[in-house]
């Protein structure tokens, strides 16, 4: 419904929570891939010179199903891991497979293969200092309700820190 009402890009801006998604707009002949702002639901993609695009929630899916010269390891990613102890968020250890950055939009024109990437796909909110306390409280209440909805029992690990104590207080 949101896509019908607002269009694909505006609807994606309005999404709140953990998500990664793919939308094909047949009227505009465009493919959209997008992830949540924190990258909690990752999305991996691979493209080749013939404009074949494969994507999935894990890089392993792309290794098995796509022959895009990914048998080679990404030496830069491996070097980053050995140097820094982690691989940069947009890279993977496989050559030819990348991870979409958190809060990003990847758009492909299916007619001509033009690719558009936006890593600042965020809705900026500016607050007055006086409104912060009230807005934070109502936002935290909403987020807690959204994230406590589960098919399984929910628990909290209390570390004694401010964040876990605050979350426990809102239960």
Give a label for each model feature.
Residues 1-171:
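Cysteine-centered catalytic environments shared across enzyme families
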């Amino acid at each position: 419904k949101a896509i019908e009402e607002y269009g694909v890009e505006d609807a994606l801006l309005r999404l709140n929570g953990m998500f990664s998604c793919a939308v094909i707009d047949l009227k505009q002949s465009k493919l959209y891939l997008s992830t949540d702002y924190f990258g909690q639901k990752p999305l991996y993609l691979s493209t080749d010179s013939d404009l074949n695009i494969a994507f999935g929630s894990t890089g392993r899916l792309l290794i098995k199903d796509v022959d895009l010269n990914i048998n080679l390891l990404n030496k830069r990613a491996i070097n980053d891991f050995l140097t820094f102890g982690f691989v940069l968020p947009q890279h993977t250890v496989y050559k030819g497979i990348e991870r979409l950055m958190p809060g990003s939009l990847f758009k492909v024109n299916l007619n001509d293969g033009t690719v558009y990437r936006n890593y600042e796909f965020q809705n900026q909110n500016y607050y007055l200092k006086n409104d912060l306390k009230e807005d934070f409280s109502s936002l935290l209440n909403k987020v807690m309700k959204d994230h406590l909805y589960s098919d399984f029992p929910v628990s909290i690990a209390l570390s004694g820190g401010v964040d876990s104590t605050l979350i426990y207080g809102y239960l």
